[in-house]
Curated annotation (Swiss-Prot):
Signal peptide: none annotated. The gene is rplA. Gene3D superfamilies: 3.30.190.20, 3.40.50.790. The keyword Ribosomal protein applies. Belongs to the universal ribosomal protein uL1 family. This is Large ribosomal subunit protein uL1. It comes from Lawsonia intracellularis (strain PHE/MN1-00). Binds directly to 23S rRNA. The L1 stalk is quite mobile in the ribosome, and is involved in E site tRNA release. Protein L1 is also a translational repressor protein, it controls the translation of the L11 operon by binding to its mRNA. GO terms for cellular component: large ribosomal subunit.
Amino acid sequence: MPKLGKKYRNAVKGVDLSLHLSFEDAVTQSIQTSFANFDETVDIAIGLGVDPKYSDQMVRGAVTLPYGLGKTVRVAVFCKGEKEAEAKEAGADYAGAEELVAKIKDGWLDFDAAVATPDVMALVGQVGRQLGPRGLMPNAKTGTVTFNVTNAIKELKAGRIDFKVDKAGVLHAPLGKVSFGSEKILGNLKSLVETVNRLKPSSAKGTYIKSMAISTTMGPGFKIDTNLVKKFLES
């Protein structure tokens, strides 16, 4: 195990990381133990009672966080003709078809999210190996393959995030910056948990949300008592 830095040790001094906390306490302590000299991101890890190797238990979706992510989201839109003009009007940072694909093949990936109209998906598929591993591949299930490019762009710019469980059944997502404060982080977390709850596969048996832990970029992870999920969503 790597040696923990002095700032980290000081931050967690006297803190019991084995406890399962309320949502409010976990968020507050995560923010309070932030120690980096930059505005850290607050992240959540949610362990789900699903087996992603079965397609009917794959949990993936998208949610627009009410308080955003505290960063500028660069959006590339794969489209042609009138849709290209519409995309630029809606705030797309890049819009086009063949020229964008050619740039990506040459190694260009200076954007944070991508949208595509259905008619150019065959073209976009040519750069699937570049986009897929970085989570940039447009997907109909998350609303990023659509002719309604204006709405998709506005959602992404407003703080929409796409998520899916990994092979271990764990879902990771950002919730904003430490500077947001507890109230906004909790608001974003509530929207995410509500969405994840709605996406519970009918084939999933037993406990659905099995574990939760929140942390900042450099900070420790604080466990959340999953027995409090219902109370949190009703609050």
